[in-house]
């Protein structure tokens, strides 16, 4: 048997997600258990959304958890480069190879033509999908349009009938009718590959033997398997893990619970406990013990024992497990060092002291001034907002609109944060001083604090959003109907002036 090679391939387009860590953990344990290699590849073909800051946050977060990869963008390896943006010269030739073999074709349809196609399909009660119009062009027509410099994409051909059988390591045989699979774009008009082409090409060139990923990719598996067949390559073994769920069984979403690893790090969760908890997502030790280390998990790991029932990511259970680790796994000296590294690290002090120094008479003043920077949720109630000028309901609405704008931000620094809040206040016809007061309370527990955008920059996007969300709930939150009404108002507000800096 050849060497087992697995990978995690995150896109650096946002905060490092606990779901990424969960998939990475299972990939690493499977590879290590078989004496194989675990790779990290950055899938940053979406250059409008990908950022170096997000990539670094992903690497730092996974390392904080204790996950190490054998090959990757920061450690190198024999199959690099490990960023897709640095492999752009590779993908085009493979797309053209498929065209030459008759497995893919040029499509010159404009966005307007495709929109019209979808409208006509919907009018007939059909599911909108590409109708294969590019396949009707003759070779001469294609060449003529290429010579004329018309923009095009390259799409893969899909069987018109029959069933694709997917042999899944966990789920057995999965059947998907080819009629449900679209003629996927492989190469976009700007020459950039889509996820599907780049993913298959890279997995082959990096000799990945097992693709262990979330179940949301099951519907893409027919396209991927067909691409392997078209290229004449051996497909890797597929294994689709169940998605993490909220306690109400809904898909894990930052709208309901914090999903960023950085949030849990900022809250003071231990990396050992976090990794332990993720290891229990659909899997358990043979002896059913609650607590185990990464080394112990690797030793006993069996991918076939993963349960397909949606694993529940319950913050209360994570907190309980974290408390066990704190009480049972550390000496006083070790715990003192952890607390020092977490709360009194030099980086945090250097960010906080410029704001605290002018307000300090003695060193003991620092704790009450800056303690909120290393706290969890602020102990706010409706009374905490009573002294602010705006009515409580209007404060709550501003917090909700601010949260939506901040969730869409791609950069997190004080000037950008202030610009977002100022623009929102102007759109709502409010003075910035009045509008921003509830944000002060949400972030610091009081309006008597450091400049709020500086505080938000220090505690970071995950904790800032979580505290604002907590404050909204402390003010009573919103019912479903009110939430829908606010979404409509927010959309209109955004149209009034400068659009939020969103991830388009």
UniProtKB/Swiss-Prot annotation:
Motif 'KMSKS' region location, chain numbering: 251-255
Q: Where, subcellularly, is it found?
A: Cytoplasm
> Which SUPFAM superfamilies did the record assign?
An anticodon-binding domain of class I aminoacyl-tRNA synthetases, Nucleotidylyl transferase
Find motif ('HIGH' region) and give its ranges: 10-20
Keyword terms of this UniProt record: Aminoacyl-tRNA synthetase, ATP-binding, Cytoplasm, Ligase, Nucleotide-binding, Protein biosynthesis
The record, for Gene3D superfamilies, names:
1.10.10.350, HUPs
Record's catalysed reaction(s): tRNA(Glu) + L-glutamate + ATP = L-glutamyl-tRNA(Glu) + AMP + diphosphate
Q: EC number(s) in its UniProt entry?
A: 6.1.1.17
Q: What is its main location?
A: cytoplasm
Example of a GO MF term: zinc ion binding
An example GO biological process term is: glutamyl-tRNA aminoacylation
Q: Which family does it belong to?
A: Belongs to the class-I aminoacyl-tRNA synthetase family. Glutamate--tRNA ligase type 1 subfamily.
Q: Which HAMAP family match?
A: Glu_tRNA_synth_type1
> Could you describe the subunit structure of this protein?
Monomer.
Known function? Catalyzes the attachment of glutamate to tRNA(Glu) in a two-step reaction: glutamate is first activated by ATP to form Glu-AMP and then transferred to the acceptor end of tRNA(Glu).
The protein in question is named: Glutamate--tRNA ligase
């Amino acid at each position: 048997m050849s060497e087992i090679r697995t990978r995690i391939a995150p896109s650096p387009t946002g905060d490092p997600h606990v779901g990424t860590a969960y998939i990475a953990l299972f990939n690493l344990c499977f590879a290590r258990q078989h004496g194989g290699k675990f790779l990290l590849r950055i899938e940053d073909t979406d250059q409008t959304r990908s950022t170096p800051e997000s990539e670094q946050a992903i690497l730092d977060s996974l390392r904080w958890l204790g996950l190490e990869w054998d090959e990757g963008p920061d450690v190198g390896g024999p199959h690099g480069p490990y960023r897709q943006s640095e492999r752009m010269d590779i993908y085009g030739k493979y797309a053209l190879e498929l065209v030459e073999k008759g497995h893919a074709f040029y499509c010159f349809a404009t966005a307007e033509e495709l929109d019209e196609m979808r409208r006509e399909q919907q009018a007939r009660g059909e599911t909108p999908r590409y109708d294969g119009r590019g396949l009707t062009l003759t070779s001469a027509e294609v060449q003529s349009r290429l010579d004329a410099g018309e923009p095009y994409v390259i799409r893969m051909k899909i069987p018109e009938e029959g069933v694709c059988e997917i042999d899944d390591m966990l789920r057995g045989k999965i059947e998907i009718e080819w009629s449900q699979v679209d003629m996927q774009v492989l190469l976009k008009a700007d020459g950039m590959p889509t996820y599907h082409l780049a993913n298959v090409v890279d997995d082959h060139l990096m000799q990945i033997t097992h693709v262990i990923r979330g179940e949301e990719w099951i519907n893409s598996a027919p396209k991927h398997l067909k691409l392997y067949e078209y290229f004449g390559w051996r497909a890797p073994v597929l294994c689709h893990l169940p998605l993490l769920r909220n306690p109400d069984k809904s898909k894990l979403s930052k709208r309901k619970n914090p999903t960023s690893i950085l949030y849990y790090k900022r809250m003071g969760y231990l990396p050992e406990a976090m990794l332990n908890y993720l290891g229990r997502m659909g899997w358990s030790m043979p002896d059913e013990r609650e607590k185990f280390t990464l080394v112990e998990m690797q030793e006993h790991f069996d991918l076939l024992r993963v349960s397909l029932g949606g694993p529940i990511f319950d913050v209360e259970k994570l907190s309980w497990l974290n408390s066990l680790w704190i009480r049972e796994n550390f000496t006083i000296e070790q715990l003192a060092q952890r607390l020092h590294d977490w709360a009194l690290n030099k980086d945090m002090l250097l960010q906080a002291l410029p704001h605290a120094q002018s307000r300090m008479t003695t060193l003991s003043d620092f704790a009450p001034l800056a303690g909120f920077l290393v706290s969890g949720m602020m102990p706010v109630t409706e009374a905490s907002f009573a002294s602010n000028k705006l009515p409580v309901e209007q404060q709550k609405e501003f917090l909700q609109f601010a949260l939506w704008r901040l969730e869409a931000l791609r950069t997190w620094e004080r000037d950008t944060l202030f610009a977002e809040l100022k623009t929102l206040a102007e759109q709502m016809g409010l003075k910035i001083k009045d509008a921003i007061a509830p944000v002060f309370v949400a972030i610091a527990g009081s309006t008597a604090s450091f400049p709020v955008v500086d505080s938000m920059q220090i505690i970071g996007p995950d904790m800032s959003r979580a505290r604002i969300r907590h404050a909204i709930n402390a003010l009573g939150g919103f019912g479903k109907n009110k939430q829908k009404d606010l979404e409509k108002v927010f959309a209109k507000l955004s149209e009034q002036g400068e659009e939020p800096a969103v991830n388009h």
